[in-house]
Amino acid sequence: DYWTALSYYKYFPPPYAMIDCVAADLKLFADLGVDSFYAETADYMDASQQFVPLKFWLAYQLLVDPHQPAEPLVKTFTDGYFGAAAGKMRDYLRYLRGRIDAEAQFKMLRDEPHKLAYLDRSFFQISETLFDEAEALVQAGGLQAKHIEVERFALDGALLFMWPWLERKLPAGETLPFERDTLIQRYERGWKSLISSRYSR
């Protein structure tokens, strides 16, 4: 029942993207001879879903030709949306998709997301580094920087939520390689950017 599939732990923000689903689903519908369909997307408001503008734009393009390859479209969109940081943002998207695909745990997402295999220390270190590198490539405070900030919000939220579990797995005397105060401040900025991007039209 998709109405209740994610009803538990609703305040936990595990980062994810639906890019692969969009391309595969629309191609399947076309192959089955579907002429039209209604897509309910209430979850676009979900603060943990990343690359939402890309998802919608990609879907519009694939509705015109569902059999065209998705990756060139992803490149076209990200080049314009993230500017000089597009390559780093695609690197993150590929990494996110790869980790989730390799370690898919749907029921865990619903019941115990803090036990998701992909949300480990390595995931956060690699992902945060990619975002650091992406932000360094664009003008601070500019539109492209805001776009990056919105995507980073879900990652930072997940790291803050996972902090206690990540700490428990550390060897004695070791600390997490993140500045918690800096992370909280960036999370607050990201929340404001997210609200502004979605509701201040």
Where are these regions (language model features)?
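Catalytic domains of carbohydrate-active enzymes that cleave complex glycans
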Residues: 32-34, 58-201
